[in-house]
Each structure stands twice: as C-alpha cells, then as structure tokens.
Amino acid sequence: QEHIFSKVWVPVFHKSELSEKGNFRTGQIAGQNILAYNDGNRIKCYKNYNVHQVSGTMQAPLITVEPELHCEVKHGGMVWTTLDPNPTMSVEEWTCGAFDCIADAIDTEEMEVFHYHKAVIDTNYKLWHDTNSEFYHDFMHYFNRVSGFNDEYFARKNIPFDNGHVNVSSFTVNYEEYAGFEDRGELSFPNLPPNQWYMVDLFPGYNFNLRGSAYRSDTVTPLGPNKVLIEFLAD
C-alpha cells in the first residue's frame, strides 16, 4: 500500500455521485480514509478522519485543516485522486493513452452511476487483476462461451502502454445466443458499434469494462497478503 497504491492516481468515485453542491463521498486509498466533496465549483479530495457516512450532503461548507489532495475528473467522469503530495504526472499522462480506444464513447454524453457493489475476496490483489486481464477464464463461464466465442474474440490482442497499463481490442458480443437475452445494439454507447466490448486495465489494479450498454469500473484495495477489497461502479 505504501510503496505502490499511495503513489499512483486512483479512480475512486464518479462525479455523478457528487453532482450537487455539498455532496460528499467517502472511501479509502492504501489503507487511508479519504473524502471527496463538491464545493459548488469543483470536486475536492481530502484525507478523512471525522466523516463516517459513505455519502450524503453537508448542510454547511466543509472546514478542514487537512491539505487538499490532488484531484482530477477524467475518462468518463471518474474522480481520480492520489495520496502523493507531488505527483509527477497528470491523470492523462499517467493513463498514457490506454483510454483512447473508448474515449469517444465515454466522454460524449454525461453518465450516471446506477449500481455500486463491494466485496472482500480471499486472494492476492495481483491474482484478481490478472483474472481481469487474461482471456482463459472466459472458458469457465457459459454465458461468455455462447455469446462471445467467435473469430473476433480469438483475434483480440492485449495492447501494452507505459506505466504498466493494457487495453484489449474489441469484439462483437452476440447476446441473443444466450437463452432469454436480446440484442443490445440499440442501447450501445455513442460512437460505439453495436454490441461491442472493450476492456482497459490499469496498473496496479483498476479495470474498466465497456460492454455496449453499460460501463463498469473495478478498483482494488489490498487488505493483506491474501485479502483484497474490490469495489464496482456501473454507469
């Protein structure tokens, strides 16, 4: 946590969770509690020692002696922050082009979070991240096999970027091949061909899935050598 997760930009929240003045959201980076707050002009982030609610609206302006953490809103409205007091790169410099493949889809229209879920998993955070970036685990999922195993699927490539990031080239998901499902082409994101699927994996453990009709972000927080907190946001 100290040597890796406290040094990088972390996609902690989505701006739709902080859409109005006074809205706040709490979370954690590298074992330290943080708070994001909409002051009416922009979203600010601080270390958090006093607010115990997950989210809400403050009736009075936030007053704190804590120094403001570096904070940016980028890549589909995600709120990024870092515990590093002197980051050497902006968020766009840090992500280094990994989002270019989906930028026109996630930045064209405003998005809104409709689901949040978290889980504590008994595994090393590296193993979880590897599962999100490799292809073989799809063979264990019936839905993935019947809806996605086609020539495009097997032609995909992991495309590497600086700073340890990768993205996975797209393929067409045939949702109608799964019993009870229908084609989702009409629900696809703007500037995205119907039923496409893209994935962006960021070092050290952040994953973004664009499945045509929904955009999901996964963040990991190591809790121990073999325990990890995983948080999911769906837009």
Residue ranges and their predicted role:
Residues 18-19, 35-43, 69-235:
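C-terminal catalytic domain of Rieske-type non-heme iron oxygenases
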Residues 44-62:
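A generic, well-ordered mixed alpha/beta core segment in the N-terminal half of proteins
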Residues 66:
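Phosphate/diphosphate-binding loops
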Residues 1-49, 71-72:
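N-terminal pre-ligand scaffold of iron-sulfur
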Residues 9, 22-24, 60-62, 200-208:
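Short, hydrophobic/aromatic-rich segments at coil-to-beta transitions
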